[in-house]
């Protein structure tokens, strides 16, 4: 789960500014939720 979050963060940095950003934020939030679930 942690590697998935890190890779999604790196992908967000590579995406141009014109790309849909909300979708990336939603994916990162989903990864954070998964990390919290595994940590808990």
UniProtKB/Swiss-Prot annotation:
Alpha-D-mannopyranose binds at residue 11. The keyword Cell membrane does not apply. This is Antifungal protein ginkbilobin-1. GO terms for molecular function: D-mannose binding. Possesses antifungal activity against B.cinerea, M.arachidicola, F.oxysporum, R.solani and C.comatus and moderate antibacterial activity against S.aureus, P.aeruginosa and E.coli. Inhibits HIV-1 reverse transcriptase and proliferation of murine splenocytes. Exerts antifungal activity through its carbohydrate-binding specificity. Expressed in seeds (at the protein level). Keywords: Antibiotic, Antimicrobial, Fungicide, Lectin, Mannose-binding, Plant defense. GO terms for biological process: defense response to bacterium; defense response to fungus; killing of cells of another organism; negative regulation of cell population proliferation. The keyword Iron-sulfur does not apply. Residues 3-40 form the Gnk2-homologous domain.
């Amino acid at each position: 789960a942690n590697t998935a979050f890190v890779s999604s963060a790196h992908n967000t940095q590579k995406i141009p500014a014109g790309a849909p950003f909300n979708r990336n934020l939603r994916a990162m939030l989903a990864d954070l939720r998964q990390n919290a679930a595994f940590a808990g």
